[in-house]
């Protein structure tokens, strides 16, 4: 599918809130003598396409022939967008084009300064007329709504009705709690928070997810209903509920992930790709984006590289791992073992462990440690081979090798949130239990063990 898509150049029209994302990179190593605040010394500035413009950049990077329709102010940000996007922009004098300035220090966002006018545009009729003039040449339409006043109910209604009459799919990245203005669109892509607000549900757990996503489809006359679930992936409702699981290995910045999702979905629908396959591909695109910093676009080459990820990069020293874990406010799950001959029982155990948090770290006994615990004939596989096998599983985020007989020193160093052991530790002392917030015991699959596998092989000889 990737080979086919990478050769296509569908014409896609984007209407919405085009904005500028500015990144001011600073050194924040001093406290001001005037007040208890950081002093930010500017090092460089980086101006990027944001909002609907980032969707445009994603589609262009994917190879689409993209055309932008929008309204901007008579200011520097408006000029920047006109110079960097192919399309037509109506100029509303005195209106501020959305400009978001992110103050960055040591790869972390410290502060964001926004300049914008969120009132409804005064040029609705002119924008609709421009759309009517252009629409017949396109294979898909994207409405990218950031609640900055361009996609008014009148504009949305006119765009959706016209496109629907021409059998052109309309994909909407919605904003706000009232989705009625998007009624009749092909699909919406709200995130979990946006969906909860629109549905007025307390949560989307268990049966509530299917109930809610189906309600969105029915209430707003959609062809497909989609909810993006962050680390849980993408939920799709067509005739029934399907989940495309998330693919991210490392998350540094979620900025722009939603833009990448709708860009890939639009590209796929413009090429008549089956919707669930499109969702799976959108997940892979989002995984690429969240591994970078800032609003960035994604290409099919990057998605291909991600699909063939070098899993050895998941094998870290404890120092490297601690630095990575500190960058994210995630729930860290830790388990450990020899994992000499990986079997079905190991797989189910690790899969269950992953579900307990956001990041699963596996502490792996080194060759010397295994020999000390199991005897001179072990391990069967070297520590590098064992680490690679564990890292190859999508539910394992990191593998770290330790030399000691127990993982106490490693647990003390990493300080995970949850420590996972097998249910056979129920009446035993769990090493490191006093360091973590919680200990979870998981039942093993019966009948599976490395020792039994080794004995079985010996018996056959």
UniProtKB/Swiss-Prot annotation:
Q: Does the keyword Nucleotide-binding apply?
A: yes
Q: Which residues form the active site?
A: 259
Pfam families linked to this entry: CTP_transf_like (PF01467), PfkB (PF00294)
Classification via Gene3D superfamilies: 3.40.1190.20, HUPs (3.40.50.620)
Q: Which residues bind ATP?
A: 191-194
Q: Does the keyword ATP-binding apply?
A: yes
Q: Which GO terms describe its biological process?
A: ADP-L-glycero-beta-D-manno-heptose biosynthetic process
Whose protein is this, by species? Campylobacter jejuni subsp. jejuni serotype O:23/36 (strain 81-176)
| Protein name (record) | Bifunctional protein HldE
Query: Which InterPro entries is this protein grouped with?
Result: Bifunc_HldE (IPR023030), Cyt_trans-like (IPR004821), PfkB_dom (IPR011611), RfaE_dom_I (IPR011913), RfaE_dom_II (IPR011914), Ribokinase-like (IPR029056), Rossmann-like_a/b/a_fold (IPR014729)
Documented EC number(s): 2.7.1.167, 2.7.7.70
Report residue spans for region: Ribokinase: 1-312
Single GO molecular function = phosphotransferase activity, alcohol group as acceptor
Reaction(s) catalysed by this chain's protein: D-glycero-beta-D-manno-heptose 7-phosphate + ATP = D-glycero-beta-D-manno-heptose 1,7-bisphosphate + ADP + H(+); D-glycero-beta-D-manno-heptose 1-phosphate + ATP + H(+) = ADP-D-glycero-beta-D-manno-heptose + diphosphate
